[in-house]
Amino acid sequence: MAQPEDKAPEVPTEGVRLVPPQVNKADRTPLGVLSTLEPLTRLQRTWGVWHVPELDTQDAEALVGLWPLGSFLVTGRDPSQALVLRSGPLPGEVNTYQIQKIPRGVSLESSNLCMPDLPHLLAFLSASRDVLPRTLLLPPPTLGPRDEHTDPVQIGRVQQDTPGKVLSIVNQLYLETHRGWGREQTPQETEPEAAQRHDPAPRNPAPHGVSWVKGPLSPEVDHPGPALASLLEEEEEDLEGKEEGREDDPEEEGPEDVLTIHVQSLVRARSSYVARQYRSLRVRIASDSGGPHGSGDPATELLQDVRHLLTDLQDHLAKDSYIRAVFGSRGPGLPKKDEDPGPALETAVCQAVLAPLKPALWTRLRTLRAPELRRLRRRQTALRAGAGPPGAQGPGPEGQSPAPALRSRIHERLAHLHAACAPRRKVALLLEVCRDVYAGLARGENQDPLGADAFLPALTEELIWSPDIGDTQLDVEFLMELLDPDELRGEAGYYLTTWFGALHHIAHYQPETDRAPRGLSSEARASLHQWHRRRTLHRKDHPRAQANLPFKEPWAEETVTGTSDN
């Protein structure tokens, strides 16, 4: 005897099509099988899983044949769509049904039942088989709310639900396209994303992972599946990775890529807090008026505003449940330093928010610093003329400069440093340049190690022969304002002040007397001390008071009387 759930309804007379009444305000149809929204909601949330428009019918039948009874896929695009169903336990028991588009909705071929749209039709067929040999088996709500005892969803990886004996794959491309569905977000952030709900076509045709599998796979079939994390990495360009020219472990970069995509989606959602802050930053960069942190210097004020906005966004996004879930998907056993999502979140915010505005930001900084940068380049040209050919009077032992190959590598790193966006990435490249400078000082055999006294003049010479000293100056200023205060207390802060000193020597070179300053002036030292205090002193009672202290740049101090720039 047929089970109640498999019992077919009475078929209307030939030529008459059963059409349910209009959907009411609660999005429910009067049909008893759709008295609950759970099947319909599950189908809507997993649309990108069961609908694979680029898959042909033959391949779909081969895939569905490996899955449990009732498993299905929808292939093709409107109006040439087909339902592929695993209808029996024997190999090859897979049926294909054409989906017809009619004025009142959609229906299966040879069926007299019409539903408003495809999800409603599939939801009905999951409860009543109509003309099908059996009801549909819906995919699990992988992207919906999870039981509090389950493990975090493994983004882009195979995950097994032991109690339910379900093997599933979270579709990364689906997450990107339908970001607003299974994650809890603020109302203003989910509203624009919901508009994408009924656009089932993925942006790029890509190998489609198995959506759900109950029980073991057929032992006769070798079923390797591409890692969805790798598909995502091929689709999303890692700008900083291209700048560095290195290949990192994709597993390590995965969470940063996913976070970046999520933040980018929030930037596109115009009513979200992230989008509003992004627009505010764009307006601030283009504005001639000063910011709220009036230090007196327009360029410094602009960078302070950028820092406060990025910090505010990171604090806001750190509370995002989706971001916590993505970072938690990396699993247990991580080193203690990797448990903090701060570095990955900083990279994501810089890539999604700061990188699109970076050309405008640097154009604005060059405009604000134009007179000082011209003077710096004139001093650089004068120093080059006095030094002769590159390497003729280097600071190394016996007047030797770094080898040409090493100097070329230093210049390449300086270019990468300027192209980088995130402060941590810039600092990493700056420290690489420092290591190269030290390597140039220790070229000779049996040579005693050289310390900071030799490093400063060596770095100064490299900057003298740098093709883009103006960009390097702005990079140093950028880092001095945007780098995390904890970083400034360590190695990064020490070398930043050293670069400040080297640029100070070049900016205050006196071509008339052919003499560079022997050390930092008292004004420059006081300015450095004030900057360090402002950036590293935490005051809980006045968290923003430190931003109001002015900071004089290396060029702000006038040179010795008698020096003229005209």
UniProtKB/Swiss-Prot annotation:
It is found in: Cell projection, Ruffle; Cytoplasmic vesicle. One of its GO terms (biological process) is protein transport. InterPro entries: SH2_dom_sf, VPS9, Vps9-like, VPS9_dom_sf. GO terms for cellular component: actin cytoskeleton; cytosol; endocytic vesicle; ruffle. Residues 182-257, 383-404, 532-566 are annotated as: Disordered. Transmembrane segments: none annotated. Residues 232-256 have a biased composition (Acidic residues). The keyword Lipid biosynthesis does not apply. Residues 532-542 have a biased composition (Basic residues). The keyword Signal does not apply. Its main location: other. GO terms for molecular function: GTPase activator activity; guanyl-nucleotide exchange factor activity; small GTPase binding. Residues 370-515 form the VPS9 domain. Keywords: Cell projection, Cytoplasmic vesicle, Endocytosis, GTPase activation, Protein transport, Transport. Residues 388-397 have a biased composition (Gly residues). Interacts with RAB5A, RAB22A and MUSK. Guanine nucleotide exchange factor (GEF) for RAB5A and RAB22A that activates RAB5A and RAB22A by exchanging bound GDP for free GTP. Plays a role in endocytosis via its role in activating Rab family members. This is Ras and Rab interactor-like protein.
